[in-house]
Amino acid sequence: MGVTKELKSPGNGVDFPKKGDFVTIHYTGRLTDGSKFDSSVDRNEPFQTQIGTGRVIKGWDEGVPQMSLGEKAVLTITPDYGYGARGFPPVIPGNSTLIFEVELLGINNKRA
């Protein structure tokens, strides 16, 4: 249970986000049946958040710090690290495993 990371394209291998850092990412979220529920890429607007502080789902708080600046990866997140039994109606059913394609574009003021 938790989050697993599949590397798609390596980052710089040097800069990794730490708890409390602000990150800029592009992502596409899908359910295991392949249906897309959200995408910053489709909106052409990267997502910014503080990581490791509970502002996003636990799977992101745990998975994004495993990525280095510029990296592209797929994060597979079990329900207990996602939206749990309640889900996120109407787009994410309860107990859903989430699959996110993520690109780490920035950490604080440093860009890939």
From Swiss-Prot:
Q: Which InterPro entries match?
A: FKBP-type_PPIase, PPIase_dom_sf, PPIase_FKBP_dom
| Domain of life according to the entry | Eukaryota
Which EC number applies?
A: 5.2.1.8
Record localization: Cytoplasm
Its predominant location is cytoplasm
Q: How is its activity regulated?
A: Inhibited by both FK506 and rapamycin.
| A Pfam family matched in the record | FKBP_C
Q: Residue limits of the PPIase FKBP-type domain?
A: 20-108
Keywords from UniProt, A to Z, are: Cytoplasm, Isomerase, Rotamase
MF annotations from Gene Ontology: peptidyl-prolyl cis-trans isomerase activity
Q: What does this protein do?
A: PPIases accelerate the folding of proteins. It catalyzes the cis-trans isomerization of proline imidic peptide bonds in oligopeptides.
| Similarity-based family | Belongs to the FKBP-type PPIase family. FKBP1 subfamily.
Protein name according to UniProt: FK506-binding protein 1A
Q: Upper taxonomic classification of the species? A: Eukaryota, Fungi, Dikarya, Ascomycota, Pezizomycotina
